[in-house]
């Protein structure tokens, strides 16, 4: 399937359009809130893995306010994963089916999108407190980049 486009906010409140990353392999890591233990661990894990995935763009998306994301990323030393806020329009959550309307949060999920905007891997984590299958997502990425 073709990856839907969406617009989220950077930690500096600048709109960011997913289509601007076309031409790269991308991991989209959806988390309910960076201020929770599993979301924290998920974002740190992808930040660590990014060093071994040259040319791969990794996006973490949550409903956290951009100010909170900026503070958290700075404190956690997140420097290889870009954090984006879906709080304004829920554009990502609506496009990818991660929006939990009653809570106005995005559920935990991981997507791998290839350079041609085709979704190659999808995981919606059924229990919000569980980790995603990192290895399955990363294996998909490695195959796409030939490493």
What spans do the regions from the language model cover?
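Chalcogenol-based redox active-site neighborhoods
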Residues: 1-147
